[in-house]
């Protein structure tokens, strides 16, 4: 016979079942491997609510803290472990590079990638930057002294190169300033090794800021210098170079035609018109395969500061171990800066010209000491020391007798550039800023100088008779000498050369 369940018995059975379930749940939770929990999916994490127990308590709360407390602690712990696992899997996606926002998040079940991103390389400077036609005021202020120094060094280099090319004991004249202007105009479009080689030849610092603007400011009214680039029709010139060249040098490359004779006439006519017909024929021929021609012509239009005596005077001059008679300039009281240089063993005299120019003569102290000996001792250091001493010397009334100055010199500059160990014009020329054509050579490069100084001066000589004092300084030039036309304002050589035979 079945026993009857009393209310008390039923209550005891319910409490016993609740405790048994709670103990089994705690045992189940505590026996789980945390690693297994971490490797589970996000969906397996229990929800935070009161429905975890299979027995639903309706309207009645338990007075046994161990049952509900154990269940609550286990669930919170599981939530924390699951959340930490989720965060660990999601973190790699948060560490993606900022410049790749389109990449998808990393899957939590996938192993992390071991591939490393390629290293970021610094941007490289273009091999052929566009011509720089701008400079700052601060760079402009410092560039004048730098350019003056460079032109002075370049002058000595050129002197020895011209001397090595010319025949012994012959006259020569050139304009360092004018040649530097032409080469710097080429430098405007040079790239790679051609650019650095030109900078070395010209004694420029690397990437010389404002050199083009400073050269333009160095122009003198007493000197007329013209440069021009001519090219064949098949050579396309970049617009950037044309614009920069026109802005900085007042000229842009001119295209030649198919007729060689017409091209020769075009070039010589241009030179004559731009030198006031002082130079009428710069070229006597032009190669049939001409692609690029560099031309430069310069002449002196300045005059003496004081007029020399107008009467004709002939005097002796030492030429090739014999004395010849040559026309002389003379003045009984010409303002002159004068001293003897022991390094060159030379008398150094400086005469003033118009337009802040001066004419410097270096002549051996005695007939036994020759001009060739002076040339061997001439280097940039000695040259600068002489010019510095002249700057500090006073002009004093001096008896002057010297040959009339008339020198005309024409020179193939390609041979001069090779003497300077610059071979780019004929072998490995890079003018990427001027043209895209990689196969380019300079067909011809010519430089012509005309230098003439007669008795005429800016200021007339006094009409009254001048008595010569016994202690008056004397400067007589009666043997071969080295000369220099110096810009006193900007301190650089405009002309340089030598005179062996004043009659030539």
UniProtKB/Swiss-Prot annotation:
PROSITE patterns on file: SERPIN
Sites marked Reactive bond: 470-471
Annotated compartments: Secreted
GO molecular function: complement binding; serine-type endopeptidase inhibitor activity
UniProt cross-references to SMART domains, sorted A to Z: SERPIN (SM00093)
Any GO BP annotation: complement activation, classical pathway
Keywords noted in UniProt: Blood coagulation, Fibrinolysis, Glycoprotein, Hemostasis, Protease inhibitor, Secreted, Serine protease inhibitor, Signal
Region entry Disordered, spans: 23-75, 94-132
Coiled coil: none
Site (Reactive bond for chymotrypsin): 469-470
Ranges of biased composition (kind: Low complexity): 100-125
Cellular component terms per the entry's GO annotation: extracellular space
Signal peptide stretch: 1-22
InterPro entries, per database record: Serpin_CS, Serpin_dom, Serpin_fam, Serpin_sf, Serpin_sf_1, Serpin_sf_2
Biased composition (Polar residues): 24-33, 58-75
Keyword Signal tagged: yes
Keyword Cell wall biogenesis/degradation: no
Glycosylation sites (chain numbering): 75, 83, 107, 243, 356
Ranges annotated as biased composition (Basic and acidic residues): 40-55
Subunit and interaction comment: Interacts with MASP1.
Protein function: Serine protease inhibitor, which acrs as a regulator of the classical complement pathway. Forms a proteolytically inactive stoichiometric complex with the C1r or C1s proteases. May also regulate blood coagulation, fibrinolysis and the generation of kinins. Very efficient inhibitor of FXIIa. Inhibits chymotrypsin and kallikrein.
Family: Belongs to the serpin family.
Protein name, per record: Plasma protease C1 inhibitor
Organism: Rattus norvegicus
């Amino acid at each position: 016979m079945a026993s009857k369940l009393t209310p008390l018995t039923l209550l005891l059975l319910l409490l016993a079942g609740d405790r048994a379930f709670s103990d089994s749940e705690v045992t189940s939770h505590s026996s789980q491997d945390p690693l297994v929990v971490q490797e589970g999916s996000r969906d397996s994490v229990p929800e935070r609510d009161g429905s975890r127990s299979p027995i639903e308590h309706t309207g009645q709360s338990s007075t046994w803290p161990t049952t509900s407390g154990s269940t609550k602690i286990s669930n919170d712990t599981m939530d924390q472990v699951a959340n930490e696992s989720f965060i660990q899997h999601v973190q790699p996606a948060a560490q993606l590079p900022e410049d790749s926002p389109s990449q998808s998040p990393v899957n939590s079940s996938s192993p992390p990638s071991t591939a490393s991103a390629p290293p970021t390389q610094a941007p490289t400077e273009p091999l052929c930057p566009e011509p720089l036609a701008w400079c700052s005021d601060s760079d402009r202020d410092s560039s004048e002294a730098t350019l003056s120094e460079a032109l002075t060094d370049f002058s000595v280099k050129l002197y020895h190169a011209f001397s090595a090319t010319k025949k012994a004991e012959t006259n020569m004249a050139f304009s360092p300033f004018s040649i530097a202007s032409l080469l710097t105009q080429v430098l405007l479009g040079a790239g790679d090794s051609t650019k650095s080689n030109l900078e070395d030849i010209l004694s420029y610092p690397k990437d010389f800021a404002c050199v083009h603007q400073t050269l333009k400011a160095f122009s003198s009214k007493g000197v007329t210098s013209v440069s021009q680039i001519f090219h064949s029709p098949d050579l396309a010139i970049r617009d950037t170079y044309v614009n920069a060249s026109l802005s900085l040098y007042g000229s842009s490359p001119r295209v030649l035609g198919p007729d060689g004779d017409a091209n020769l006439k075009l070039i010589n006519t241009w030179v004559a018109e731009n030198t006031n017909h002082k130079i009428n024929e710069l070229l006597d021929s032009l190669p049939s395969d001409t692609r690029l021609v560099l031309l430069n012509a310069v002449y002196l239009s300045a005059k003496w500061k004081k007029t020399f005596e107008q009467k004709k005077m002939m005097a002796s001059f030492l030429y090739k171990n014999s004395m010849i008679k040559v026309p002389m300039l003379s003045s009984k009281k010409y303002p002159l800066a004068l001293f003897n240089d022991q390094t060159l063993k030379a008398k150094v005299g400086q005469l003033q010209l118009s337009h802040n120019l001066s004419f410097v003569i270096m002549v051996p102290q005695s007939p036994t000491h020759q001009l060739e000996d002076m040339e061997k001792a001439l280097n940039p250091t000695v040259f600068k020391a002489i010019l510095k001493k002249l700057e500090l010397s006073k002009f004093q009334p001096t008896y002057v007798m010297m040959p009339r100055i008339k020198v005309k010199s024409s020179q193939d500059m390609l041979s001069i550039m090779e003497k300077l160990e610059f071979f780019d014009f004929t072998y490995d020329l890079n003018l990427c800023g001027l043209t895209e054509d990689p196969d380019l050579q300079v067909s011809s490069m010519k430089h012509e100088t005309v230098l003439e100084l007669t008795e005429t001066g800016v200021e007339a000589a006094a009409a009254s008779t001048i008595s010569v004092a016994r202690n008056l300084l004397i400067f007589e030039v009666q043997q071969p000498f080295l000369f220099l036309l110096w810009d006193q304002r900007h301190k650089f050589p405009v002309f340089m050369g030598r005179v062996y035979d004043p009659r030539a």
